[in-house]
Structures are given as C-alpha cells and as structure tokens.
C-alpha cells in the first residue's frame, strides 16, 4: 500500500500531519489527520447545549476563531437537519472568503 505523508501541514496552529494510504489502483483507502496536542475542549463542551458550541468553539484558537465558529454552525445544521436559506449560504461564503 502506497503512503503519502504531508508533514508538517500548514494553516494549523501547532503541529500536525496527514497520511494518505492508496490501494493498488491508486484510490484512497484510508486517511489519517494527526494533531498530537491535546487541547481538552471536548471535555469542556460535554453536557453543554449544542447551540452553545459556535461560541465555545470559536475560543479554541486565537488565529482562526471564525473557522471554528462556522464549523460548529454547520454541525448544528446537520444535527437539526436544516438547510440554510440561500442568503445565509452566501453570507457564510463571504465570511470564509474574508480569510
């Protein structure tokens, strides 16, 4: 099995790497995203209302709070099985494009 390693990865505060394993046909068989630092936010979030997560996760990192906020918001969309209206999708795109 062929392995592709991207180490270090950029646009990440701290350390991290990605390992991609390809099968005999060259298709991705498995992928691992590894970040060795434990931040402990998972424990901090346990027992909290899901609706609080965008505000809590935006404090994970001082470099990219918006990305964490938006990821938590998308997770809420999936949790509640909602599709944001087109205007909201455009606004989210604009926010992502600001960085």
Label each PLM-derived region with a short phrase.
Residues 2-99:
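Active-site- and interface-proximal helix/loop "cap" or "latch" segments in soluble metabolic
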